[in-house]
Each structure stands twice: as structure tokens, then as C-alpha cells.
Amino acid sequence: MVKIEKNKIYLVTGGSGFLGGELIERILGAGGKVVTIARNEGQLIKLKQKYPEVDILPGDIADRFDVQQAMKGVDGVFHLAAFKHVGLAEDRCRECTKSNVIGSLNVLEEAVNNNVKFVLGISTDKAAQIAGVYGATKYVMEKLFEQFEDNYPTIKFRIVRYGNVLYSTGSVLCKWKELLKNGEQVIVTAPEATRYFWTIEQAVDLIFDCMENASDAKPYVPEMKAMSVGDLLTAMSEKYLPNGYSLDIKTIGLQPGENMHEKILEDGKYSNEVERFTIREIKEMI
């Protein structure tokens, strides 16, 4: 079992992001101290304003020196930093690999050099059914965690793997919401496609559940419900489209790196084979 200890220092890579902010709040609430490294200086400043006690370090996990500086005096690591936009990863393969593979390797090696108690990494269902660069880099990251677990048994290496988090940074939902509020046309890839979704609170809950219950570095996977892209868009239009406006959709088809249906486990069910959220449930979530 791994848990947050009072006054111990925890490194959160990518802490300026959507998931990072929620995780940092939980760590602080449990009495821990936080240092975070991220590339987005503007978001780091906002984080510092909200949580003055957090030590911020503008930097890049792909830069070994930056990781060395961030890792000093750390007791545990939450590795969130990633290049995670599926479409951009196809065009920026080098950048995606630098962040998700080289950056992860830097974090793991410096964690060993500093003898931390644990390293927990965030993966994705895209690693279970690889269709593009992003999923491939996350799969490699998972394998690195497993090898480090085998080679350095005094440190706990853990991986959580799940689907999409509602309104995460770069999510198309943020764009859809604004377009719908203005009664504008919404571009959608494939309404019949299905995806695993849940809330930011559930995502952070899984991180702590993994710390408490996972026994090795194999991906720690939750049971998740799914929704179709069409149902999600219907729920959003019912909630955000002004009265008197009709839903205007332009369908463009699946893009490079995307699957019609996702899996969380390689031998698990596709997202169109599991329990679905109802429109009402989706509206409550969004």
C-alpha cells in the first residue's frame, strides 16, 4: 500500500494541467507537500496563485536537467505530463515521443537515482488498441514502468489506465460547448463511435485507489461505462443550445489515430459492448 504522508514532498509532472490541479488539491488536503514541473508558464502562475504553498518549476520532462532539479528531496512521483492530443501526435511524432517516452524514461531514471518510494504514471485506453502515435508512446511508457518494477523492487511503480476525462485540456467538448451556446455548427468525426468517459473526480479517485490496492506495475484498470459520440452531442445540445436553434452537425469521419470503438484492456470488451450512459446521465455529468 502507498499513501500520502503528512509533510512529505510529492512531485507532480504536468501539474498545471486539468488533472494535475485536482490531484494537487487532494495531495495538499491529505497533508502532503507538492512540487510540480510543467512547460506552460501561464498555467503554472495560475496554479501558484491558487495554491501558494506549491513549488512550481517551469521545465520540460524531456530535459534531463529539469527532471533532476524537480526530483530533489521528493518522496513520491505522480507522472501526469504528456503529449496527449491524438491528432497532433500523428503530425508531431517526434514531439510526442520526446514527452511520452524520453520524458517518462527521464522521470523513471531520476526517481531511481533519488530512491523515491513510488512512481505512478497515467496511461490511456489508446494503449490497449493502438491505432496511432499517441497510443503507441503510452504503450511503451507502460512497458518501461513494468521493467523498472522488475529491476528496482524497492520502489513501487504503478500505472493507471482509463478512457477520456470530461472537459480535460484539449478536449473537443470544450469547443462543442462554446459552439452550441452560440448556436453554431458543430464538427463531429463519427456519431456512432463510442468512447469511455468519466469525470475528473473519478479519475483522481482511481489514482488513490491504485496506490492503495495495486500490487504491481501492470495497468490498473477501472470498470467504465461508455457513451456514443452522438449521444454525447445530443445531451450537450439539449443542455446548451439556445431556444429556437436546431442542432447543426457536420460529420467528417474518423481521423488518423482514432478507433471507432475503444478498449481499456487488450482482451477486454469494446466500448460499444459495455453499459452505456443514458442521455439523462450524460447531461448530469456535463
Segments predicted by a language model, with ranges:
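N-terminal Rossmann NAD(P)H-binding glycine-rich loop of SDR-like oxidoreductase domains
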Residues: 10-30
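A short, basic/flexible loop-to-alpha-helix module at the beginning of a structural domain
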Residues: 1-7
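Conserved residues in the N-terminal Rossmann fold of short-chain dehydrogenase/reductase
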Residues: 38, 57-58, 98, 251
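Conserved glycine-rich Rossmann-like NAD(P)H-binding loop of the short-chain dehydrogenase/reductase
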Residues: 32-44
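Residues in the short beta-alpha loop(s) of Rossmann-like NAD(P)-binding domains
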Residues: 40, 125, 225
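Conserved Rossmann-fold NAD(P)-dependent oxidoreductase catalytic core, especially the SDR/UDP-sugar
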Residues: 79, 83-87, 91-142, 147, ...
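Strand-loop microenvironment adjacent to phosphate/nucleotide-handling motifs in alpha/beta enzyme folds
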Residues: 143-286
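NAD(P)H-binding glycine-rich loop region in Rossmannoid oxidoreductase-like domains
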Residues: 49-55, 61-98
